[in-house]
Amino acid sequence: MVRAKSWTLKKHFVGYPTPSNFELKTVELPPLKNGEVLLEALFLTVDPYMRIAARKLKEGDMMMGEQVARVIESKNAAFPTGTIVVALLGWTTHSISDGKNLERLLAEWPDTLPLSLTLGTVGMPGLTAYFGLLDICGLKGGETVMVNAAAGAVGSVVGQIAKLKGCKVVGAAGSDEKVACLKKYGFDVAFNYKTIESLEETLKKASPEGYDCYFDNVGGEFSNAVTSQMKKFGRIAICGAISTYNRTGPPPPGPPPEVVIYNELCFQGFIVTRWQGEVRQKALRDLLKWVSEGKIQYHEHITEGFENMPAAFMGMLKGENLGKAIVKA
């Protein structure tokens, strides 16, 4: 019998999550049936969306999330022992699957790249950047792009794709170390929003002519400031609002209506699961190619040990990670 450890939601979050919100449980998994596989987690992801998605869980449910896993026992010919897969299996060390929810690595995945990238730059965050920028914003060469949380898993890819497409990129991050990383990635302007005197003046200095596209990972007052400096017919892709996820009071006011109206701005929220099938596979191949060629750089913030899943999650929500937050099981 295999014993699986799982992190569950003990109590719903109020404000920032704390260790008391989580409980580690151990269960014995049943023997495999025909068509099933037994999976062992290798890497697990913690992402901002989990803070909001957890509202739909019942107390006692396992926390949700993707992981990279290895098949360690198989009664399914499509997934022999040793196969590496990516799947939404939750915060658990071991799982049983019938194979329907499992995604194999891209056939061209090189041995030189870490498997954990399938949870970051060549996974859900990278796809979010890809489709949010190219489809939602409809990015064109020569435009000016603003992205916040720019040193994170999504924002760092947004900026680098925009540079690949011939755009000017301005990025905001929350530490000098992160700003240095953005400059290494080729951002034209990068600033630490925690140490500047005026966000409005910093944005204006970075791009006096304004912004064509804004990729919003943060929401709140920051986004209102950017909205006021968008160009005519500017496009805003609303990916996240991490600045508001842990609020206990009322949400901040939205952008000035007159700015939205008279500049004819387009706001669109989106969830990356919209894109499936071949269009998704093409995006993954593009991302893998760019990473393999060194055109997109990446940084991972890896926490060792499955027992540290809650700590990694809480640290990510407070911006302690540089790049993609990953847990190595």
Curated annotation (Swiss-Prot):
The keyword Oxidoreductase applies. Ubiquitously distributed in various tissues and leukocytes, the kidney and liver had the highest enzyme activities. Changing A149V: Reduces activity by half. The modification N6-acetyllysine is found at K178. The modification Phosphothreonine is found at T18. One of its GO terms (biological process) is lipoxin A4 metabolic process. It is found in: Cytoplasm. The modification Phosphoserine is found at S20. One of its GO terms (cellular component) is cytoplasm. SMART domains: PKS_ER. NADP(+) binds at residues 152-155, 178, 193, 217, 239-245, 270-272, 321. InterPro entries: ADH-like_C (IPR013149), ADH_N_2 (IPR041694), GroES-like_sf (IPR011032), MDR_fam (IPR045010), NAD(P)-bd_dom_sf (IPR036291), PKS_ER (IPR020843), PTGR1 (IPR014190). Optimum pH is 7.5. Its EC number is 1.3.1.48, 1.3.1.74. Down-regulated by nonsteroidal anti-inflammatory drugs diclofenac, indomethacin and niflumic acid. It catalyses: 13,14-dihydro-15-oxo-prostaglandin E1 + NADP(+) = 15-oxoprostaglandin E1 + NADPH + H(+); 13,14-dihydro-15-oxo-prostaglandin E2 + NADP(+) = 15-oxoprostaglandin E2 + NADPH + H(+); 13,14-dihydro-15-oxo-prostaglandin E2 + NAD(+) = 15-oxoprostaglandin E2 + NADH + H(+); 13,14-dihydro-15-oxo-prostaglandin F1alpha + NADP(+) = 15-oxoprostaglandin F1alpha + NADPH + H(+). NAD(P)H-dependent oxidoreductase involved in metabolic inactivation of pro- and anti-inflammatory eicosanoids: prostaglandins (PG), leukotrienes (LT) and lipoxins (LX). Preferentially uses NADPH over NADH as cofactor. Catalyzes with high efficiency the reduction of the 13,14 double bond of 15-oxoPGs, including 15-oxo-PGE1, 15-oxo-PGE2, 15-oxo-PGF1-alpha and 15-oxo-PGF2-alpha. Catalyzes with lower efficiency the oxidation of the hydroxyl group at C12 of LTB4 and its derivatives, converting them into biologically less active 12-oxo-LTB4 metabolites. Belongs to the NADP-dependent oxidoreductase L4BD family. Monomer or homodimer. This is Prostaglandin reductase 1. It comes from Sus scrofa.
